[in-house]
């Protein structure tokens, strides 16, 4: 396992790359994010996030263009007192990313040349899933976790 770390958060790079490669292949151009939203929701559940902590808002019903889904929101309790933290990324990609076929070239992930990659959006999503996997054991120790 390739692990990058600093004093606070070790990062499982191999897992992040696996999630990224998967997410890059899931369709999700702007307005059509239902498939990638479902894939991310499923990945979060697989790393231990309770389904009750995952929700979608109704932003898609309040904007003037047709969209499939609202924002994916995950509410998790903290591990210590203090102000809440927000981690944010986006799910959608530009139309040039439709049908993306990512591949590895050494330590790089690239498109096959027929589409754009969509790595900006999906890298953030993969990182958040891996960070949740890393912290889930500590979060589960917080009183009230089972009440979600």
Question: Where on the chain are the PLM-derived regions?
Answer:
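N-terminal capping segment at the start of a domain
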Residues: 2-32
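General structural feature for long, well-ordered alpha-helical segments within catalytic domains
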Residues: 12-19, 32-40, 70, 83, ...
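Short glycine-centered, acidic/aromatic-flanked micro-motifs in structured strand/loop junctions
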Residues: 26-28, 58, 89, 148
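Generic secondary-structure signature for well-ordered alpha-helical cores
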Residues: 22-29, 45-50, 133-140
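Short amphipathic alpha-helical segments at helix-loop
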Residues: 21-25, 56, 109, 113-116
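A non-catalytic alpha/beta surface segment that caps or lines the substrate-entry region
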Residues: 29-79
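Active-site metal-coordination/substrate-binding segment of hydrolases
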Residues: 43, 68, 75-77, 81-148
């Amino acid at each position: 396992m390739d692990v990058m770390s600093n004093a606070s958060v070790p990062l499982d790079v191999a897992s992040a790359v696996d999630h990224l490669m998967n997410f890059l292949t899931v369709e999700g151009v702007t307005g059509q994010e239902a498939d990638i939203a479902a894939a991310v929701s499923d990945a979060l559940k697989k790393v231990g996030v309770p389904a009750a902590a995952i929700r979608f808002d109704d932003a898609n019903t309040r904007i003037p263009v047709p969209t499939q889904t609202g924002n994916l929101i995950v509410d998790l309790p903290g591990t210590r007192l203090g102000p809440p933290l927000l981690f944010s990324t986006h799910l959608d990609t530009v139309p040039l990313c439709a049908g993306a076929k990512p591949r590895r070239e050494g330590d790089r992930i690239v498109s096959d040349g027929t589409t754009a990659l969509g790595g900006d959006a999906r890298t953030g999503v993969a990182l958040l899933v891996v960070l949740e996997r890393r912290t889930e054991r500590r979060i589960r120790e917080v009183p009230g976790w089972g009440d979600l």
